[in-house]
Amino acid sequence: MRETSHGARDNVDVRLRRVGATSHTEREGTHDQGPKMTRVIAGAAGGRRLAVPPGTGTRPTSDRAREGLFSTWQSLLGGPLDGERVLDLYAGSGAVGLEALSRGASHTLLVEADARAARIVRENVRNLGLPGAEVRAGKAEQVIRTAPPAEPYDLVFLDPPYAVTDDDLREILLTLRSEGWLAEEALVTVERSTRGGEFRWPDGFEAIRSRRYGEGTFWYGRAASTCEDAR
């Protein structure tokens, strides 16, 4: 999982594909309000700015929450990111996936259903110039059913709009596992509204911990290994 170096890829791989259209960006009632910005916190692109899709629908993960996410990942991995493959579903501005590349991931797939938001993710990738990014425009549940990835993912982050139910997310997690998207013991993080109560993991996943950041809570889990399934 860690043998690929962060600098091993030569080109920024930005593939914008259309597979359908609900997303981290909720389009109803949104309108242009001028550019909003966030930033990469640390790593090779630390301090660089990222554009955020205009309007009120996108909920960028705050710096504090994002720092907490990567601190927890580092603790669970036993060290900094080093060549992991990262899947960022409901990518919004792409801040989490691009933060992962900046901190040492070898590849990030950023999936976003809203076409305008996906274009901004692509612009952020190009502006940062970090290798190893791939962008797909489409609904998460459709993208993960189109074809299995060339290689499975070690870290997965899901921050869907509030309209996506816990049952919807459990179905997506089961599909990720059955369709070969998850590496052995992949770490999976789900962000949900704090007011929604406890997130229950589906069969095949082990709950690890949770962390609250204001109105959102991160739920950390791990895909069970095939050895555990066989028991």
Feature map (PLM): residue ranges:
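Class I S-adenosyl-L-methionine-dependent methyltransferase catalytic core
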Residues: 2-231
